[in-house]
Amino acid sequence: VAGYRGNTFNAPAYITILSEEKDNYLINAGFMAENLVLKLEEMGLSSCFLTSDDSEMIKKVLLINSDLAVATVIAFGYGKKERDTTKLDIHSPSNVSISNKAGHIAPKIAATALAFDSDFNTPYNFDDEYSDPVIADAVYAASLSPSFLNHQNYRFVINGTHIYLFNQLDNVVPDDDNLLGLGAAMLNFYIILASKYSGIGNWRFDTSDIKADFKNPSDYTLVAALDI
């Protein structure tokens, strides 16, 4: 009913997030859930998004009486120390940094492979003399977000102060898990920008006014945009 790759996931505690089943509700749930995950990390706790295959059964088992759907379940507790990696440190909304963290992380796609300049034919140049260091940090922060099997199906296209987010659905990552991970990446990207720039807009899902040719592969779809 809830687990990871078809297996049960035993943890001392769980967080269940419920939602109305509206447009983009899973992306929104992933966005909110990642905020909770970062708070758990701040408290020294490890966590994991679980696949939720049967909302009604989960509510029945947990004695939840609600018309809302189970959007996601997060398992958390004190994890075993394995090796050093990196994490986001959120000291306040205006003070966010990336630091070393003790724990385990599976290999992920490099941040440099996740971002493009204006279109998919031009990789984003992360060299300090060419790139905006805040945007570079935001892409890196997004790359640290939870992603099912670390597939990281999202891509960023950066055109000056305009950020375009693309997503790929595939046969490996369940669509629900894909969208939850997309929301988590959006949160990490956003909080880095918001910590350095004042007055930035919010992610928007209505991209019908955007007519640019991003030269994106046919399996990548524009899902959101953000103006700095």
What feature does the model see in each segment?
Residues 1-228:
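Acidic, surface-exposed loops and disordered segments
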